Amino acid sequence: MIILNGNQLTLDLLMKIARDHEKIEIDLESQKLVEKASLFVKDIAMHDEPVYGINTGFGHLANVRIDKKQLSLLQSNLLMSHACGVGDPLPIETVRAMMALRINALIKGYSGIRLETILKMVEYLNLNIIPVVYEKGSLGAS
């Protein structure tokens, strides 16, 4: 079992996760950081002050305020707008490494993502439930 904290993932450990299917876990301090950031973002979303990408549109719609009732739809639409990819699927070990790297970055507590989402990513990685990621055109965002 490899315990991730966002700061100590080495190439050797990453290869154990990607190639050897070593299971991972998130340390408690990192979980607290994620929860704190998530609550901060949730609090911002519920206030009237506009904050880009949380309760406003994106890009040229940055000045458009999104109603509180539509915030969940805004986030769903953002995910759908990034769902693209062409070419051959990447090898599973590459995607496993990508998942581990993403989890490791998210547990630093800077994104505002919910802990439940990260724990689900960990569960999927540990169960070897791996998404198809295509070699060209995949997008990523914080």
Per-region residue spans from a language model:
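Conserved, well-structured ligand/cofactor-binding cores
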Residues: 1-142
